[in-house]
């Protein structure tokens, strides 16, 4: 079964890594389906039933986004609030439709990895900063598989650095 990659980037056309990752996934259409939230909902009016039906079709789901302001783009929070509803995602006999689905995060972080340490400039690890995602996935009984992060694009946006991100990203998706 294919993996659904939900891309949440407000300006993917001007992105560096996320745009490259999407291009790579397009090469493997037999393994991955890409769903871009900002392209699907430019006015940010989410079709909740369509999103729920989409999620129900997959056993493996990855949310891909740039990490800025120490979180995800706002449309992802809105998506969680509107799509992961009581009675569907949790809390009743018919709930937990996401239960047991393998879920992961694919994150691009402009800042270097060593800055996301207790001794770095931001004092917290990326694992600590993404804890709300893990808690959400645990609450809806999904099988959270952690995250893949690629750091440092702000300091190094060379073609070599970008291409270096692709094999481990695809390997992360394959291993989900």
Model region roles, listed by residue range:
Residues 42-58, 165-168:
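Glycine-rich, highly charged phosphate/nucleotide-binding loops
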Residues 5, 34, 63, 103-107, ...:
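Structural beta-sheet core signal
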Residues 49-134:
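Helix-loop-strand module that forms the ligand-binding subsite of alpha/beta enzymes
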Residues 1-32, 165, 169-170:
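N-terminal beta1-alpha1 ligand-phosphate binding loop
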Residues 16-20, 46, 74-78, 160:
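Generic recognition of short, well-ordered alpha-helical segments
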Residues 31-44:
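A short beta-strand-loop structural module common to alpha/beta enzyme folds
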Residues 31, 61, 143:
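Residue-level detector of anion-binding/catalytic polar loops
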Residues 22, 26, 130-176:
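Glycine-rich phosphate/pyrophosphate-binding loop and the adjoining helix
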């Amino acid at each position: 079964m294919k993996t659904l990659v939900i891309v949440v980037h407000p300006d993917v056309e001007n992105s560096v890594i996320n745009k490259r990752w999407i291009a790579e996934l397009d090469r493997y259409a037999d393994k991955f389906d890409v769903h871009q939230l900002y392209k699907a909902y430019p006015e940010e009016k989410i079709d909740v039933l369509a999103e729920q039906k989409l999620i129900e079709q997959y056993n493996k789901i990855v949310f891909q986004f740039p990490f800025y302001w120490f979180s995800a783009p706002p449309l992802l929070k809105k998506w969680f609030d509107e799509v992961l509803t009581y009675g569907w995602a949790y809390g009743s006999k018919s709930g937990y439709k996401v239960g047991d689905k393998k879920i992961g995060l694919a994150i691009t972080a402009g800042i270097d990895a060593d800055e996301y340490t207790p001794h770095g400039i931001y004092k917290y690890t990326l694992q600590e900063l993404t804890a709300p995602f893990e808690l959400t996935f645990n609450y809806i009984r999904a099988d959270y598989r952690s995250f893949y992060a690629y750091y440092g694009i702000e300091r190094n946006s060379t073609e070599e650095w970008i291409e270096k991100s692709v094999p481990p990203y695809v390997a992360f998706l394959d291993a989900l």
